[in-house]
Amino acid sequence: MSIKENQLAELAAQLDKCSSCHLRNDCQAPVGWYGCPDSPIVFIGEGPGGVEDDYGCPLIGPSGQLLDKALWSVQMTRDRVLTSNIVKCRPKGNRTPDLAEADFCAKIWLERELAILQPKVIVALGSVAMHYLGDPAMRITRQRGKWFKTPQGYDCIATFHPSYILRQYGHAQVQAKWDVYHDLQLARAKAVETCPDYNLCSEKPVDLFAEFQKRSG
């Protein structure tokens, strides 16, 4: 194992035991991260949903399946990037985590992940991730597709969360998909610019359901 892999394994063992806030009371277990620690690009969503809680993998449900298709369209695959979330435990009823919950959890876990990973590019999936990594005053409809620096100095670009696209219909959904495609192209280009020798795409998309077993209980 590489140094990063060892450090993430130690962090994952600590995460499994986390009971620092009330969100832990309503989920099966915390959900960590997935992907390659050496990737120059990290995708950060808001938090686990029901399917993610069942399987212990971020973005494995309908939103994650749409993300996989979007990544494939710009020659990236989930095993060659890294995906994580702002909060690690599923909020009750799959609700959106509030700012206080996001801030509390991310400062304990996400900040330590990023300190290990040192990504060249971060893609904030949706408003929750964008607000934490950027500014709570930002609006996703205005900020998406534009670069900004996180407080820690990482280059970050925001785009719509896949769940937002799934809630759209007709022309609005088509437009949102094109917007995300454009944003992912920008993110990929910067990742390639910073790490030209890193391969962002495997020969075929990863089947996460074949890789992860459903949790019991």
Residue locations for each model-derived region?
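A polyanion-binding, active-site-adjacent surface
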Residues: 1-217
